[in-house]
Each structure stands twice: as C-alpha cells, then as structure tokens.
Amino acid sequence: MAVQKDSNKSLSPLITQASERHWARLTEVWSEGLANLTAAQQQELKTVLGLSDYIANQLTRSPEWINALFADDLQQVERKLFDAQLREQLASATTEDMAKRLLRRFRNYQMVRFAWRDFLDYASLEESLLDLSALAEALVIGARDWLYKEMCVQYGTPMDKAGNPQPLLILGMGKLGGRELNFSSDIDLIFTFPEHGETVGGRRSLDNQQFFIRMGQRLVNLLDQITVDGFVFRVDMRLRPYGESGPLVVSFSGLEDYYQEQGRDWERYAMVKARSLGPWNHFSDELHSLLRPFVYRRYIDFSAIESLRKMKQLIAQEVRRRQLTDNIKLGAGGIREVEFVVQSFQLIRGGREPSLRQQSLFGAMDTLYSLGQFEYLAVDELKHSYLLLRRVENLLQAIDDKQTQTLPNNALDWARLCYVLDMTNEIDLRTHIEAAMAKIHRHFKATVGGEEGEEKAEHWTAQLWNVQQDDHAINLLAEQQIDDDKLWPLLSRWRETVTKRSIGPRGRETLDKLMPRLLDELLNQPSPSAAFEPVSKVLEQILTRTTYLELLCENPGARQQLVSLCCASPWIAVQLAKFPMLLDELIDPAHLYDTTSLDDYPSELRQYLLRVPEDDMEQQMEALRQFKLSQQLKIAAADVTGVLPVMQVSDHLTFLAEAIIEQVVMQAWQQVAVRHGVPSYLAESSDTGFAVIGYGKLGGIELGYGSDLDLVFLYEAPENMANSLTNGDRPIEVGHFYLKLAQRILHLFSTRTTSGELYEVDMRLRPSGASGLMVSEIARFGEYQAQEAWTWEHQALVRSRFVFGDNSLAVKFSQIRACVLEQSRDKDELKKAVREMRQKMRDHLLKVSEGEFDLKQSPGGITDIEFIAQYLVLANAHEYPELSIWSDNVRIFGVLAELELLPLMSAQHLTQSYCWLRDENHRLTLQQKSGKLAYADVAAHAERILAIYQAILE
C-alpha cells in the first residue's frame, strides 16, 4: 500500500467540501467497498477526491479500480510494461468498437494512477512526463499494430516493388516526441511509409498510399473519437506536409521532397522534437536521416533567431486576439519561450554539433551548458522556472482532464494548487509563478535580441492626450507646428465621449497607452483632423473589446495600416468599424497587400473552412462571411494603393464570389441530403445534377464592392427519372429536392450573422421572374428562352455565364445560350425593343439633380454601353456565332471590332470609357459616396458614348 508523503498536511475547507461531495457520490455506488478500506486508505482516497474532479468522476464510474490502485505500487510505474499489457488486452478485440473500449479503459485507469501520484507528490515532474509520454506512445503503437493486422486481412499487406512489407511509421511531434507530454495534451502526429507499391494477398489490391490513408483515418478515429468511455488522445495531424489540405499519409520520398522544396522555418522548429514512435528499426533510421538536412544545416545558422522572433510575434498576437490572460504557456515568460530559446540554439548549432540533435529539452539544455553555449546560472534559472510552470500546467490539467494552461479563475482550484505545491495562498503562488516567468522572459529577450519597444519618455502626444486645458493643447500643437485648427476640438469632444463609456480599468489603461501612439500616426497625415474622424469611428466600435485595443497598441504596423486605409477609403473604415475581426488583417502589411491569386480562392476558402467543424452550421456560415470580408478588405487595400487596376479588382471580387458560391451550394447539398438523401440516379455519382448561372455583373466578371449576385438555378433529371424519389429517410420527388436545395442556398446567403449577410441574391432573372419557380429543369429553361422570353431577357442572357455545376450541365447551358443568342432577329424590331427597355430603366432609376451625372443610368453612362454591346450581339450573332462566346463587355467589343461590326475607334472609345466609368464607380464606393459625379467631369466620355449609342440604336 502507498503511504502519502506528508500525512500531516491538512486540507483547506474548500478542498474538504469537494472531497465530501465526491465521497458521497462514491458511497452511492460502492459503499461496501469503501467500508473495507483501511483508515489510511480512506484518508488518502478522500484527499485525492478533493484535489481532482477527474479522479473522482473516473472512480465513480469504475469504483473497482480503487482496490486495483491500492494493490499497485502507486509510488512506482513500470512504464516498460505498457506495451505488453496493452498488446495482451487488444488481442481479444475482434471489432474496432471493442478496440476503442479497451484503449480508452486502459488509458483512463493509467491516467487516474498518474494523477493520484502527481497530487500526492509520489513522483517528480520528470517522472510524470516520461510516464505520460510512454503511455501515449504505447496506446498509439498498440492501436496502430492492431489496426495494421485488421487492414492486411481486408486489403492484403502493402509491399514495395521488391516484395518487402511496408509499415506505417508515426512521427511523434512536440512534447510527445520529446517524451515531455503533459496530462491533457493532445498529440501531434505525422504518418508516413517507406515506399510506393500495392497490397498483396487481400480480397482486392490497393495502392500503398491509399491503404495507409485509410488506415490513418481509422487510426485517428480509434484514438480521437469521443465515446461513452471518452477518448484516448486528441490527435492533431496539422503538422503534416501541406497541413490540413495535404494527404493524411505520404511516402518517405514525398516527405523529403516537401521539406527540401517547401519546408518553412516554423516546421524546422517543429521537427527538432520529431521522433519515430515504437520499436526502433532501419526504417526509423532512414526516416530520421532524410529529415536531418532540413532541420540541421551544415553551417552555423543564425537565421533561426529571426524565424523565432517572427513566430513569437505571431503567438503574442494570438494571445491578444483570444484574450489569453494568465496563460503560463503562451504568455510572456511562458513555457513556449523556454522551448524557443533551447530549440533556437539547437537549430543554430545542431548542424555542426550532433550532440544537440535530440528531442529532450532537459537533455538539450545540459548539452548546451557542456558546449559553453549556456552559463550555469542560465541553465539553472531556466530549468527551475520551466519545471515550476510545467508542474502547475500538469496539475491544472489533472484537476479535470482539460487542456488548459490558464491559471484558475476560482478559489477551489487555487487551493488545490497551493496544497500540492506547499504554498500559503494564491498570492504566494502567483508571486512564485510571476518571478519564474520574469526570469524566462529575460533569457528569451537576450536570445532574440529584445523586442522593439515603444515606451517613449513622456512623448508630447501623451501630453496632448492627457491635457485638460484647451490653451495648453493648442500651444502643444503650435510648438510642433501642427496647423490644423479642427484637430483639438475633435479630439477633445471624442475623449469626453469616451470617458463616459464603461470600458473597464484594463480597457482604459490600454486606450491611454494606445492614443499617444495613434496620434503619432495621425499627425503624419496631410490633414490630421480628416484622418481622425474615420479612425475614431473604428475605435468607438472596439472600446469595449480590449483585445483589439491591445492589438493596435502593440502592433505599429497595424496602427499605420489603420490610419492609411481609413484615410484612403471611408468604405474600408466602415468595414473595420462594423467587423472588428478585420483588424487582424492589418498586423502584417505584406500579407494584407498580397491578394490571393485568382485560381487560389477555392483552395484558400476550403483551407479556411477546415478550422470549423463540418456539422456546426452556424460556425460554417460565420466562417464564410469572415473569409469574404477579409479577402474583400485585401482587394480594397490593393485597390486604394494602386496595386490592382479596375479590371483586376472586378476579377478578384468575381472569383471570390464564385469560390463562395461553390461552398454554399455544397454545404446546402449536404444539409438537404442528410434529411432527404439525394436523387436515386445520383447515388453512385459525385455529381449534383445542379447548376448556378451568374447574370449581370457576376456573369460579366464585373462585380464591384457590395454588388449583389444575380443568379439562376438549373437542374437536370433524366427523362425517365423526372418523378423519381430521393434515397434518404424522408424521400421526396426530385423537383421538390432541388427546390429545397435552392431555398437552403438562399438561406445560407441571406441569413445575418454577427458578420452580416453573405451576399444579397437577386433571382428575378429566372424564367417568369418573381412568379416563376425558384429552380428550373434545364430542358424547360431552354424552351422558355427559345419560345417565351422577352427581348430584355435575351439581353440579360448575353451577360450570363455558367459559374457552378456539373460539366454536362455546363455544356447544355452553353448550347442553349448560343442557340438563343444566335437566333435571327429583325433589327428594327430589336432596336425598338432595346430602346424602349432602356427608356423604362431611365424613367424608373435615373434620379439626378441639375448638373449631376449618374455613372450608371445617365445618358452616355455605363448602362448605355452595356445596351450597345447587347444589341450588337443579338443583332449579329446569327451570322457571327463567335459573338456569343463572351459575357463581358470588353471582350465583346474586341470581337465586334475584329469582325468590323463596330469601327475600331468606337470600340476603343467604348472600352476606355467603360473602364473609366467603372473605375470611378469603384472609387466612389470606397469613398462611401453615391455613383454620381458633376456632369462637367464626365462630359467628354458621356458625349462620345451617347453619340455611338444614337448612331447604332436610333
């Protein structure tokens, strides 16, 4: 039987209350067993029940473990036995569900044992971390080996080309790799296999990579899935090549190619701790040999310091954004800083010093001391400070098996920590923790060369922000030669308004630090008062969100971008004020102005959505909106700084919309299919039988900021299947299925979340307009266009384009569109119809004062140009089918000029004027102004356009 080390320690009243509560629960399920315990055993059990809710909950579920725990030697763990014990238990598992239960029961028993030892101080921290790491490794390898046998029975054994069996190797990363795993840590893994080939001896052959990807998926499920018995470990696979967008398993050669060609600096840091799990063999040797050149350079590599600085900056930004106060891992002087210090030295000198190529943090520290890279005092301070933080972290997590590194926010958990660590009270323990973190941060700053501070000694802008008398403020501005008499009244009134707001002491302190720094930026603008107005509107929206004030306070680049973008575009200022999450985009100017490549929007969006659980519909909707807002901000930032010309701005906004349309349709499809299944004839297909047609600006690849989407939905059903049903639990007719799909798509677009509406969608261009069905069968759509549609609907069809759907539907839509546009038409009747429609639009939409010009609707404006293009296509496409190819006006004018249907000079005038007018419209949008200019500013363009319009259409 184990004996508690200090049996005279008394429990605090809070711990005693927790103990009594858990003892009462345990008595309800195991009263006879408790009565049979000795007095010493009862006292020890009561102590651990009071210290750990996790132990209490597990023992209440499995009280028979209590006798087993007392029978075991709690003061010693034979971690070498884990593998054999687990192998013996898993041998009886005949299904994955049985294996899951055995793995989880084994894990939970051992974790209770470890927590018991930790809380009663039976084990040093180093022992605990080794025990936890050994348990995790045994569980991962035990699950892998059991699953490998199951998979080989099903698919055969994976072989290389020479006929040698191929294993799945697992790299343990992070603390698992370093054998320093804490109590509730997730485990970072990378799966790999030696060589390509295929399986042999199974019911059907599989490519090796397919085999191992399936095995990897099932292995993650074995370990990570939450069942009634909990989970084994949370598994994180994001450190693999290409992260979440990469294959789950890659070959050795795939790993080598990735790290040689695309490996990033942070991945070098991650790879320092990488270790092949399980028994070591020649494959393990080969794997570590191919990774070594990427991690450890042959030369002394001081670039590691700069990489470290950047990574720490990103972590600090994340801490601020997520408001992680009291975080002993990520905060200044936290656990991560010790790891960074040691790993940076390993990366710098590991290429020359093989002894530094080790996963253990403590071992690396000792080696650095022996090599003369660390002073004894530095090693001693770092070790003792690190051990204290890791001990606190381990105990925090063992209280309730939660993955936390944040100090408690309740008195009971502080009492528990103080009891185990022999501290008098919370203040005493906090003092020790803060002292340890201060020592760590001092060594970290010495390693990375410090951090650029901004604490300027009583800068005059601090005086300006704090000054109370108007005369004093005006004198301060005059001394600095600031000639802007509107600034002080604005600043003074705003400060008075802010003073009345309830923003809390932390918010107030942060604002007082931020404002002098922000004033520095504002006073560098041509008109500080004009700059202050939009910036102050943003600040007003984040006053109660201290994390964003801190972000601006501690990031000079973000402040600079905030001021410059708000000055350049009131529209951007409004976006930042409405959606403060966009402030995160300002942190890295290089990233902000690096717009996504046109073809990369779909993959970027897929990557972004991977952060959100697939089954969390609200979070998926919010993520779509956040992605749109952040990408739109990047486009606007590049626009106002002249990085993107107008044609490319519209291209980016259009391609962004198309990527979002694809995701919205697929999400809607999944949501409807879960309830009703899919059309039976699509059960074995990845096709949807559905298409989205873009009209108007989307169709013409000419979207602007805030443009709505003109959409038409089509579907295709085989003739003999038109009335067939879906294959789900609640089957419905195919037409009804696609109607529900259309309704769900519109819901996903239009629902307002905290990040607003995704897009406003206009469906009025569908067959029969507002009175028509929400979605049309494509054959019926073709009939309508050919026989019933009005001329204005054919004009709209000129600007239509297939934007999402199956290839077969794309072909059919293109055929219908070409067939309709290429109809022979009476030109006089066509002219009359086009002119009448143009006049109707003008009568309905044109509202200008004298001397004003509406860029879209005034005579000689954008709409006149569009009508010229549409008329010329409809009038001539029957003779010149190439006119039906394009949906955008610029390329239509190009084709018309080539065919000599439009004089070259006229085509150039129309194209130039069209681009200029759209550019002005973009500019006015970014200035938060309506699309109107003084007629005098537009006269040259308008008169030229009107002359061409009249020559062609009148």
Swiss-Prot record:
Catalytic reaction annotation: [glutamine synthetase]-O(4)-(5'-adenylyl)-L-tyrosine + phosphate = [glutamine synthetase]-L-tyrosine + ADP; [glutamine synthetase]-L-tyrosine + ATP = [glutamine synthetase]-O(4)-(5'-adenylyl)-L-tyrosine + diphosphate
Q: What cofactor does its activity depend on?
A: Mg(2+)
Residue ranges of the region described as Adenylyl transferase:
458-954
Ribosomal protein is among the record's keywords: no
What domain of life is recorded for the organism? Bacteria
- Give the Enzyme Commission number: 2.7.7.89, 2.7.7.42
Keyword Repeat present in the record's keywords: the answer is no
Question: Sorted alphabetically, which InterPro entries does this protein's record hold?
Answer: GlnE, GlnE_rpt_dom, NT_sf, PII_UdlTrfase/GS_AdlTrfase
Q: Could you tell me which residues belong to the region Adenylyl removase?
A: 1-452
Using the UniProt record, name the top-level EC class of this enzyme in a single word: transferase
Show the GO MF annotations: [glutamate-ammonia-ligase] adenylyltransferase activity; [glutamine synthetase]-adenylyl-L-tyrosine phosphorylase activity; ATP binding; magnesium ion binding
- Spell out the GO cellular component terms annotated for this protein, sorted alphabetically and separated by semicolons: cytosol
GO term, biological process aspect, one: regulation of glutamine family amino acid metabolic process
Keyword terms of this UniProt record = ATP-binding, Magnesium, Multifunctional enzyme, Nucleotide-binding, Nucleotidyltransferase, Transferase
Disulfide bridge positions per record = none
Q: Which CDD domains match?
A: NT_GlnE_GlnD_like
Described function? Involved in the regulation of glutamine synthetase GlnA, a key enzyme in the process to assimilate ammonia. When cellular nitrogen levels are high, the C-terminal adenylyl transferase (AT) inactivates GlnA by covalent transfer of an adenylyl group from ATP to specific tyrosine residue of GlnA, thus reducing its activity. Conversely, when nitrogen levels are low, the N-terminal adenylyl removase (AR) activates GlnA by removing the adenylyl group by phosphorolysis, increasing its activity.
The UniProt entry's sequence similarity note says: Belongs to the GlnE family.
Q: What is this protein called?
A: Bifunctional glutamine synthetase adenylyltransferase/adenylyl-removing enzyme
